[in-house]
Amino acid sequence: MKLYIHKDIFYPDAWWVKFKWLFDKKYKDINYEIVNLHYENNINDLQIGNDDYCICRFGHYEEDFELSKRVYPLLYEKFNGRIWPNKEDWYYYNNKKRQLEFFEKNNVPHPISHYSYGREDFTEWVNENNLEYPIVVKKSQGAGSEEVDLVYEKEYSWYDEVNRKKKFFDETDWDVIDFPSIIQQYIDVDYDIRIAFINNKVLFLKRFHQWKTKNKDNFPYGTDKKPIEKKLKYKLAPYEEPRCESLDEKEILKLLPIVNYLHDKFNTISIGWDIIGDIENFKVLEFSYIFQNELRDCKSYYDMKTKEIKNLDYDKRLEFTFIQNEILKSIKEISYGS
């Protein structure tokens, strides 16, 4: 088996550097090549064996995503489906409309939601579902909490000359919405939970919603904007990371029925689900394959093989190749059955 690793040139924290480190230090028996797979000529020139495998880190940075959309079908065909992210992972990545369709098709609990094309459609949906403002609005494309806002009703007033009194009416603040968008029931919670399946490990992270007391422009996490120079240089999300907290063993045990439920719905090498609520009334907000070491705050994980909760020691949590290592272990298991 030979591995072909995408040279993700758009990001200073390039994945291929981390993979190269792993190959040189830990997986010396694996033959590999680093290739910029954004270009069709590079893909066409590859001499692929029957068991060769492709690993791509395609992010949601606009230029990267547009190039990736063009070449992914070619890569999938070239490697006969032996590619990470797989076809299903890629289909739902960065596309909240498709994720909503997945929820509806598979009866996954989620907030009342709708893909809205305009004002009339928006108003009709709010009234039909007897929803109260605010309403959550999400761009149909975008990862995580980017492009997510709360929409309120604005109060308008005018003076009635005939009756000589001031009158008022409320109307949706349309300026906040860029149609078409996902519109969603607002559920007031203090935090959400990221449940991340990485190979056979399940990690949990509580992320606090602080928009009410901190930065109200950043719903729901309330963190400050990143310096523009840093954001542009490293192709980062616009806001700082939310305040996070690891779950203790009791909290994890309570979530295991949800873990098994989600695993049955979508079983893949690396995927993260954002949920709110508990086992009695949990709802899924969105999901996506994971390519970032975003779970460094986790202190433990659930082992899907042994059905045990295990400690994740400090060095492991900070290991900069954690996700890359788990992906390689999973691919070796698929290829060699060990």
Segments (PLM) and residue ranges:
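Generic beta-strand structural signal
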Residues: 115, 197-198, 277
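Active-site nucleotide/adenylate-binding loops and adjacent lid/helix of ATP-dependent enzymes
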Residues: 4-6, 90-181, 252-253
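Phosphate-binding site of ATP-dependent enzymes
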Residues: 150-254
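Protein kinase-like catalytic core scaffold
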Residues: 135, 182, 203-204, 271, ...
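Short glycine-rich anion-binding loops that position phosphate/pyrophosphate groups of nucleotides
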Residues: 59-62, 140-142, 290
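Conserved N-proximal alpha/beta basic substrate-recognition cap immediately N-terminal to
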Residues: 9-115, 124
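C-terminal active-site "lid" helix and adjoining low-complexity regulatory extension at the edge
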Residues: 240-253, 264-268, 277-338
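Conserved protein-kinase catalytic-loop segment immediately C-terminal to the catalytic Asp
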Residues: 136, 276-277
